[in-house]
A protein has these predicted regions:
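Hydrophobic "lid"/C-terminal helical patch
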Residues: 114, 118
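Charge-biased, low-complexity intrinsically disordered regions
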Residues: 102-105, 112, 123, 127
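Conserved catalytic-core segment of NTP-binding enzymes
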Residues: 3-106
Length: 130
């Protein structure tokens, strides 16, 4: 296959979600799409740790895994539709990469991220889903 999608769990900055390190090292991704929850003020289950910024997480990922973050998805928990739209716009301007909410925006936006990062890929109509 031309593209393999590997779902991850947790962030490199999370104090207990070590599986993300194994996923990044083991899969050797050419590109990563990061997910961020803008309404969270602290890391899940650790209120003493402030939620990292997408910029800091991107820096960690790109340094640790020698890869490129090509997009950002928004975890919209505790956000209104207008807050989601504002967050997408803000992060696109701040980070210089495309952003979307995969659950409330057209899913084609995720494909757009991949095709923009890899222009030599051909659009193929077959999609395998599980």
């Amino acid at each position: 296959p031309d593209v393999i999608i590997i779902e991850g769990q947790g962030a490199l900055s999370h104090p207990t979600y070590l599986s993300s390190t194994a996923i990044l090292r083991g899969s050797l991704p050419t590109a990563v799409i990061l997910q961020h929850a803008p309404a969270r003020t602290a890391i899940s289950d650790f209120p003493m740790f402030a939620m990292p910024t997408p910029a800091s997480e991107i820096n960690l990922i790109e340094t640790f895994a020698d890869t490129k973050v090509i997009g950002l998805t928004i975890n919209h928990e505790n956000m209104t539709a207008s807050e989601i739209t504002a967050a997408i716009t803000m992060y696109e301007l701040e980070l210089g990469i495309p952003a979307t909410d995969a659950l409330t925006r057209p899913t084609g936006r995720l494909l757009d991220m991949v095709f923009a990062a890899f222009p030599d890929l051909e659009v193929k109509p077959s999609i395998v889903a599980t």
